[in-house]
Amino acid sequence: MNAKLKMHNTYDDTLIERDIVLSDASTGAVIAAIENAFDSADCTDETVFEIEREDGIIFYCDQWSDYTTAWSLYRHCNGSIQEWVANFKM
């Protein structure tokens, strides 16, 4: 399944979008793809992050917790990186 990753910094209205393939990907592969997509992004505590699957389902997080990696984003949003990835891969 394909998905679009979106990162919107509401402070300066910067929007970054990346495409990602979710089907048949391990949890680690999905995490790595997300980290790579936003690695150079200027994330702040006013950043909105979401993944929109091709079937229209959106998974949303309203804050990037320490501005550096997707790992901290997952912990901030759901407490469990495995659960978060499993949810949007379904």
Residue spans of the language-model regions?
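Acidic, low-complexity, intrinsically disordered interaction modules
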Residues: 25-85
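Short intrinsically disordered terminal tails
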Residues: 1-2, 87-90
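Short amphipathic alpha-helical "recognition" segments used for binding
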Residues: 8-10, 21, 54-56
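Short aromatic-glycine-(Arg/Gly/Cys) micro-motifs in beta-strand/loop hairpins
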Residues: 1-14
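Intrinsic-disorder/low-complexity peptide segments enriched for small residues
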Residues: 3-5, 20, 71
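A short, exposed loop/beta-hairpin motif centered on an aromatic-Gly-Thr core
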Residues: 14-25
